[in-house]
Swiss-Prot record:
Pathway: Amino-acid degradation; L-phenylalanine degradation; acetoacetate and fumarate from L-phenylalanine: step 6/6
Name listed for the protein in its UniProt record: Fumarylacetoacetase
Chain sites annotated for binding substrate: 147, 245, 249, 355
Pfam families in the cross-refs: FAA_hydrolase, FAA_hydrolase_N
One annotated GO molecular function: fumarylacetoacetase activity
Family, similarity comment: Belongs to the FAH family.
GO BP: cell death; homogentisate catabolic process; L-phenylalanine catabolic process; tyrosine catabolic process
NCBIfam families on file: fum_ac_acetase (TIGR01266)
Domain of life: Eukaryota
Annotated EC: 3.7.1.2
Length: 421
């Protein structure tokens, strides 16, 4: 089959060819109304302009106003038939042999914007955010550090996707500075706890699923139908203050050590775009209980990378590489488990995967693991470092390598700035 091509010039190394078309929300000017968009090459396609021109002419979307909203929530709520229709329409009107947009100079000028000149914002209203703990390698490494080899992974971990409820209000878009959090820490021994800026600030390499239609209160989602409730994935950095977290987490789990900031990438890559990169998820032993047993257990071959640009330096260092395949619990199992007690999910809710660590030290997904809680400093082109310092910039990237094209997520970037005096 010939590779689908667009009339938009897209470089071979671009994350955003016509095979991808990820969704986001942008503002052409800082004071303009937000509008939904898809990315293609170096351009942003304004979906409100496409909608107003009547180009969404399918049965579901022809009279819909979902792309005239300032966020994606209404579109997310419409479900997979609408998502598939939108994708089909967009691929058709952007294809190289379709004149309806290609040859309409007025509409092209109205619809396309240079990505480098627009402001991207959080693309949906996030009512709730839950963070899972789905990588076995990450769970094992944390257990080895804090509990020892005898109890590295708690028995319940292999039985259910562990999670905690995060703070939706502090989720920010890529490029937003992160203020070093303040809180209580506790030194070794019997010393009194201290209060002040975190001394062990860390990143966590994660991805997150964006919830689509969701479910009514009291009506769980079957694990084999869960994919129809996941619109797509994005990159996520769940910034973590390890010293605050270690002192506070017993007995109820993370609080101030996590709630100060979570960064997401601006573009949501749909499950339809990821479908060619689906792969078998790890075999689960013991077998999951029936409500978590999937007919097909799918992960995705998404290569992930973290770059650290130390404060005052012009160069960045690649400090780890991992892959979405390293998740033990699938995103569909995570969603099904979340709802099995009757909990209702809503359009735009965010489900984080937890840190995606691989089996080898160069694939660990956070500094806690990479430096083994500060005991093994990281080498950075002639200098060493344990945790994040003020001025450090962390950038995630993720991409699927296709045959002649990429399906990528762009980047997820944040810089650490000092705590206020």
């Amino acid at each position: 089959m010939a590779l689908l091509k667009s009339f938009i010039d897209v470089g071979s190394d671009s994350h955003f060819p016509i095979q991808n078309l990820p969704y986001g929300v942008f503002k052409p000017e800082s004071n303009s109304t937000p509008r939904p968009a898809v990315a293609i090459g170096d351009l942003v396609l304004d979906l409100s302009a496409i909608s107003e021109a009547g180009l969404f002419d399918g049965l579901i979307l022809k009279d819909a106003d979902c792309f005239l909203q300032p966020n994606l929530n209404k579109f997310l709520a419409m479900g997979r038939p609408a998502w598939k229709e939108a994708r089909s329409t967009l691929q058709r009107i952007l294809s190289s042999n379709e004149p309806i947009l290609r040859d309409n100079d007025v509409l092209r000028r109205k619809s396309f914007h240079q990505m480098s000149k627009v402001e991207m914002i959080v693309p949906m209203v996030i009512g709730d955010y839950t963070d899972f703990f789905a990588s076995m390698h990450h769970a094992k490494n944390c257990g080895l550090m804090f509990r020892g080899p005898e109890n590295a992974i708690n028995p319940n971990w292999f039985r259910l996707p562990i999670a905690y409820h995060g703070r939706a209000s502090s989720i920010v878009i890529s490029g937003t500075d992160i203020i070093r959090p303040r809180g209580q820490g506790h030194p070794q021994g019997n010393s009194e706890p201290y209060f002040g800026p975190s001394k062990k600030l860390d990143f966590e390499l994660e991805m997150a699923a964006v919830v689509g239609p969701g479910n009514e209160l009291g009506k769980p989602i079957d694990v084999n139908n869960a994919a129809d409730h996941i619109f797509g994935l994005l990159l996520m950095n769940d910034w973590s203050a390890r010293d605050i977290q270690a002192w506070e987490y017993v007995p109820l789990g993370p609080f101030l050590g996590k709630s100060f900031g979570t960064t997401i990438s601006p573009w949501i890559v749909t499950l339809d775009a990821l479908e060619p990169f689906g792969c078998q998820a790890p075999k689960q032993d013991p077998p999951p209980l029936p409500y978590l047993a999937e007919k097909e257990s799918v992960n995705y071959d998404i290569s992930l990378e973290v770059q650290l640009k130390p404060s005052g330096r012009d160069d960045s260092c690649v400090i780890t590489k991992s892959n979405f395949q390293n998740l033990y619990w699938t995103i569909t199992q995570q969603l099904a488990h979340h709802t099995v007690n009757g909990c209702n999910l809503r359009p735009g809710d965010l489900l984080g995967t937890g840190t995606i660590s691989g089996p080898e030290p160069d694939s660990y997904g956070c500094l806690l693991e990479l430096t083994w809680n500060g005991q093994k400093p990281l080498s950075l082109n002639g200098t060493t470092q344990t945790f994040l310092e003020d001025g450090d910039q962390v950038t995630f990237s993720g991409v699927c390598k296709g045959d002649g094209y990429n399906v990528g997520f762009g980047t997820c970037t944040g810089k650490i700035v000092p705590s206020p005096p």
